[in-house]
Amino acid sequence: MFNSPVPKPVIIPAVLMAALLLWAGCCHSQTPAPDSKEGKQYPFIRYEANQLHYDSTSASMQLFLRKWHRVTTTGQGTVNIIHMGGSHVQAGVFPNQVRTNLLSSHPSLIGGRGMIFPYSAAAKCNNPDDYKVHCAEKVTLTRNVYASPEYPLGLCGIAVTARDVPTRIQILNTEKGFDYRTTHIVILGQSNQGIVPAISYEGRDVPPSYIDTATHRFVFNLRQPVDSFDIVLPCQKGQTFTLTGVCLGNRSPGISYHSIGVNGAAVPDYLKCSLSDDLKLLRPDLVIFGIGINDAAGKDFDTVAFKNNYLAICDTIRSVNPLCAFIFVTNNDSYRKTGRRRYAVNNNGPLAREVCYRLADITGGAVWDQFEIMGGLKSMEKWQKEGLAQKDKVHFTRAGYRLIGNLLFEAMQKEFAKPLPAVMETPKAPAKKPARNQRGKDKRRVTIQSKPSSNSNPDSDRFPYIPD
């Protein structure tokens, strides 16, 4: 037996030590942090599946990725992303997490806040957290989930109507992380009595710079940037004005992430809306589709109608931008309420997932497989036990929505980080009308199929409270 010599202490220069610490910090920062609040890894989440699935020869995906690379490397141009869905999107936590991550990655490219809607101007209607809305006067709410909406609807799928009295809707920006001041406001809406809205800020009412009656746009070019303002609707007895959306822009290049969501909305509900004019205003480069949880809520889920209704929306978008890229988000795992405190797993989740892959194949889009990533069938119960999903086993908590937003962002970042080919591959252009043999035997039925009512989730149309 022998004694080991005592090693001499190694003295590391301070500069080298700092460099090593910096390197270690960089390596640590590249580790996925699914929940920005807790940084916790969950054993039931399939992190290895967190990616976008698409054909690398897709023209729309190639062009979007090239445009993203060009804008983010040169600082010139704009990228417009629309995120469409139901209550998962209206609540705002999920899309805002994706938006926050994208803009934080490119702080010099803060584009306009984009399309918003004053949801809480109406009673019992929830608003995203990054802006507050107040309206003292009573307004009538119209949503695309209604069987026959009384008032016209646009891309937002929701409207508020002022009637008989002057109405003031206050929009207060509460986002402190980004400069969302705007110099360009577009009020979307119409009045059969010729009511013209105004914008009020710093104690004065400003009329529109110009009015486009064909597209129902009232455009305001402001002399100074504002982050909060009032929408003034000067109605008198017997007069109405229906507000269908508000678009906030600026003159800076950058990224705009528009979230469009209506509680309880299914795919056919958006077919009740006039989409084209508002789409021409935004001209999206990418649309993230998160509609489907309400379509698949009932036992009699019609996958053919689900696919064809989705294709009808895709056709409308492609009529505005023929090479708009699509990401189809598969439904989250969910349960169906069967009685008091009793739930049964919703087996339609895998069926909706298959349709999303079919849609991506037809349109040249991508799939973000939320269903697979979160753990597959019956995984929602595990999310609930961890405080990530609500008791209804359909909606997430705030922590859950933030986690989902982080995961989607990370999947997108993986694509952004890939080197672009020196020469663009021969693209597979998305066909405006897929061949008959691609559609199976459905013969492209685009009749609007309402979501099931008798067997649907009773909570799907309710205002989803999202606890911390």
Language-model region placement:
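Active-site neighborhood of phospho(di)ester-bond hydrolases with catalytic His/Asp-centered motifs
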Residues: 83-85, 110, 117, 329
